[in-house]
A protein has these predicted regions:
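Extended, charged alpha-helical coiled-coil/arm scaffolds that mediate oligomerization and mechanical coupling
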Residues: 1-46, 50
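C-terminal lobe/lid and adjacent interdomain/linker elements of RecA-like ASCE P-loop ATPase modules
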Residues: 126-200
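Walker B catalytic acidic pair
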Residues: 117-118
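GG-anchored amphipathic helix commonly corresponding to the ABC/SMC/Rad50 NBD signature/C-loop
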Residues: 72, 76-79, 92-114
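Conserved D-loop-proximal element of ABC-family nucleotide-binding domains
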Residues: 108-109, 121-129
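Short pre-catalytic strand/loop immediately N-terminal to key active-site residues, enriched for Gly-Thr
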Residues: 82-89
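Long, charged, glycine-rich C-terminal linkers/tails
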Residues: 44-68
Length: 200
């Protein structure tokens, strides 16, 4: 009878789903531990000493994406327990954690262009240089666009644009200008000193 055949097909499909979903769950658990450890290690050099990154896998009935929900958790300091990333990380921390994840997963990621806005908020000196080097490393395999105010980050770029704002007719107008090699050097030097660059 067709009703019995249909029930049997449904049972077979359910068994196949559970088998594949179980394999996916095992792979996710292993990948979550590895990625969590690597991102936590990267956070130490990105001005988040003592910070931890974890991936929580919470089981539920299942859907087309598997048998668990996935949530990124972070703690900015060793004394804090990890909380949902979106609720506890500042904009700059989010950007740096995203940068760490992108660098770590770059070999398997298919994203052709990455955009980082204010990845350097709240950092300077050596940490800024590390961020710049990580961005440059990412840029060897894909296009990376980064808005930055730090010369240590800007100096790592292959191409530079300068964004400026001016008052016009009672409003503010933003403009963007491509910087040629000499202008790039001058702009990075200006960022270092904060003043107009002169010949002396």
């Amino acid at each position: 009878d067709s009703g019995g055949d249909e029930a049997q097909r449904e049972q077979m499909a359910q068994a196949q789903y559970l088998d594949l979903a179980g394999k996916l769950s095992a792979a996710r658990k292993e990948a979550a531990q590895k990625l969590g450890g690597k991102v936590s290690a990267a956070m130490q050099s990105l001005a988040m000493a003592g910070g931890r990154f974890e991936i929580a896998l919470t089981g539920f009935e299942g859907n087309a994406h598997g048998l668990e929900e996935i949530e990124f958790l972070v703690s900015a300091h060793a004394s804090l327990s990890p909380k949902p990333l979106a609720k506890v990380a500042s904009g700059g921390e989010l950007s740096r954690i995203s940068l760490a994840i992108q660098v770590i997963t770059s070999k398997v990621s298919l994203v052709p262009t990455l955009i980082f806005d204010e990845v350097d908020v709240g950092i300077g000196g050596g940490v800024a240089e590390i961020v710049g080097q990580l961005l440059k490393q990412l840029g060897t395999e894909r296009q990376v666009l980064c808005v930055t105010h730090l010369p240590q980050v800007a100096a790592q770029g292959n191409h530079h644009w300068q964004v400026s704002k001016s008052s016009q007719g009672g409003g503010v107008v933003s403009s963007i200008q491509v910087l040629e090699p000499a202008a790039r050097i001058e702009e990075v030097a200006r960022m270092l000193g904060g003043v107009e660059v002169t010949a002396t």
